[in-house]
Design a protein with these regions (language model features):
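Metal-dependent de-N-acetylase/amidase catalytic core
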Residues: 2-13, 91, 95-259
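Active-site rim/loop-helix segments in enzyme catalytic domains that contact anionic ligands
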Residues: 1-113, 140, 144, 248
Length: 259
């Protein structure tokens, strides 16, 4: 598959579940697009208020508000100033009214008129249910309101999975034994290898979300962390037909499905 160029993406709309999803999976893409003068808009479904393993340092009662502030600072480091927060409670996306959530995304799409929508694939990268649900919402909204726009799913490549398997086993970040995905190179529509100033910029953006990243950086070391976050990869979504699209439609409608 021929690789896409950043400028070919046009106006970019990212749709994610929690603050920091957008930075981990697409900070380089967003920064490059903004540097090229393109419009980039970010949508986050929740404030991530349940996202801490250290409640002493990051009190849960204040975490949602803190993560909202962190997300703005992180996006600002990438040149992104347009951020929509849907306000769902962290961990409850699968229990929300899917039709209403999709309607909200349709309204945002109608306003932004993106050329490219970026979100999780149906696997949710880590298998998190919020990630998988938001993928389904974004896919359904794309079909309704922006069928002519490109839909990109964030993914992990076989090379990335191989290189970092020991770290992934140590961190235990994947909630599904079939993850991470091992997308072959020929199926990758866009891969960004960040180095130099661009890698530094992504590191700054992630460090701005200290409630999520400070502990991890301290655990594995900044240089290793910087290398780990330096790959971003995306596949073109199958936007019509096929078992994968059927699974997405079932999840968007609230019907349980195994992906």
């Amino acid at each position: 598959m021929a690789q896409l160029s950043i400028t070919a993406l046009g106006t970019v709309l990212g749709v994610w579940a929690h603050p920091d999803d957008e930075a981990y999976l697409s900070a380089g893409l967003m920064a490059l697009a903004r540097d090229a003068g393109q419009r980039v808009v970010c949508v986050t479904a929740t404030r991530g208020e349940h996202g801490t393993a250290d409640p002493t340092t990051w009190p849960p009662g204040r975490l949602g508000r803190l993560r909202e502030v962190e997300a703005r600072a992180s996006l600002s480091a990438l040149g992104v100033t347009e951020h929509h927060l849907l306000g769902y409670v962290d961990g409850t996306c699968g229990a929300q009214d899917a039709a209403a959530a999709i309607d909200r995304l349709v309204d945002i799409i109608a306003d932004v008129r993106p050329d490219t929508i970026v979100t999780f694939g149906p696997d949710g990268i880590t298998g998190h249910d919020d990630h998988r649900t938001v993928s389904a919402w974004a896919t359904a909204a794309h079909r309704r309101a922006a069928a002519d726009a490109r839909l990109l799913y964030a993914t992990t490549t076989a090379a990335f999975a191989d290189r970092w398997q020991d770290l992934h086993d140590r961190l235990d970040i994947y909630l599904d034994p079939d993850l991470p995905l091992r997308t072959p190179a020929e199926d990758v529509a866009l891969e960004i290898q960040l180095d130099g100033a661009l890698a530094d910029r992504k590191l700054v953006a992630l460090r701005a979300q200290a409630s999520q990243t400070a502990g991890l950086v301290a655990t594995i070391g900044e240089q290793r962390y910087r290398a780990w976050i330096a790959t971003e990869a995306f596949t073109l979504a199958p936007t019509s037909g096929g078992a994968l699209q059927t699974a997405v439609e079932h999840r968007a409608s609230g019907t349980p499905v195994t992906l």
